[in-house]
Amino acid sequence: MRQILITLSILLFSSLVFSSEKKLGNITYSNGANYKGELKDGIPNGLGFLSLPDGGKYVGEFKEGIINGQGTVTLSDGLKYSGEFKDGKKHGQGIYTYPTGEKYVGEFKDGKKHGQGTWTFSDGR
């Protein structure tokens, strides 16, 4: 009986561990967005690439289907943010680069510039 319980415990544990492994895959969303990258239980988790129908794109980390960690988002108009994300929003250190050549390097909180930062104009000032 003890041998059976040990065997069942090992099988149950190994199935839980292996069922949640990351795999590579593609997801096409109903709005036309397309995700390619690591999946855990069929959800973006880890490194991935998200292309949007309007031409925007995101390359970076996902956690449980949400943008989290380091990444870069580039919009179709050329606006670019590279830095930290939390719960799908810019949060932490990052760099905003505008199509005009202007740049903001600094802190973000809840998707907005917040805290210390440096603004550089397109002429270098």
Task: Indicate residue ranges for each PLM-predicted region.
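Conserved anchor residues at repeat-unit boundaries in beta-strand-based tandem repeats, strongest
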Residues: 34-45, 57-68, 80-91, 103-114, ...
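Positively charged n-region of N-terminal signal peptides that target proteins for export
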Residues: 1-4
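Cleavable N-terminal signal peptides
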Residues: 6-7, 17-18
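Intrinsically disordered, low-complexity repeat/linker tracts enriched for polar/charged residues
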Residues: 24, 29, 47, 70, ...
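N-terminal segments that cap or nucleate solenoid repeat domains
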Residues: 19-54
